[in-house]
Amino acid sequence: FEPSTRTRVSFGTAFNLLGDLVRETTGMQSSALAKGESLYDTARVISAYADAVAMRHPDAGSVAEFATGCSVPVINGGDGPNEHPTQALLDLLTIERELNRFEQGIDSMHIALVGDLKYGRTVHSLSKLLCHYKDIKFSMVAPDGLQMPSYILDAVDNAGHKIELVDKMEGN
């Protein structure tokens, strides 16, 4: 429902590699949603045609709402400013692979998250994943007004990690 070439092509490729067929929607403008159908009802109909649904939507909480009406698994490909767990999994895999090249792991690393941390759904999901590791120091670098939401900071803090909030990058 939210356009993204990379998300659409990567999920399509993954489904094809798993031996499944891909059925794509053409966006919200030409869907029953544009005529007032609820996400729940749309999910009920789409799940009758699919083995699984990968969904990307511009509204927060939309993927969870869709999943309540769906009878098949729903994969969150991004829901508004909330989450993007599949991208976070890919980012985590990339971080692990790069650190493994140097025979290091994620535990005890110093990780900087930089940019729009308030609306950056990928960093929300990645921060939650990183909570499962040990002794990480997070530097959260964002301008005032775009700092990480408090519920993410609370999750990181409750996992026992150190947090440094910074409003700009400083050169040496």
Which residue ranges define each predicted feature?
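Glycine-rich phosphate/diphosphate-binding loop of Rossmann-like nucleotide-binding domains
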Residues: 1-13, 97-172
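Phosphate/diphosphate ligand-binding glycine-rich loop within oxidoreductases
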Residues: 4-96
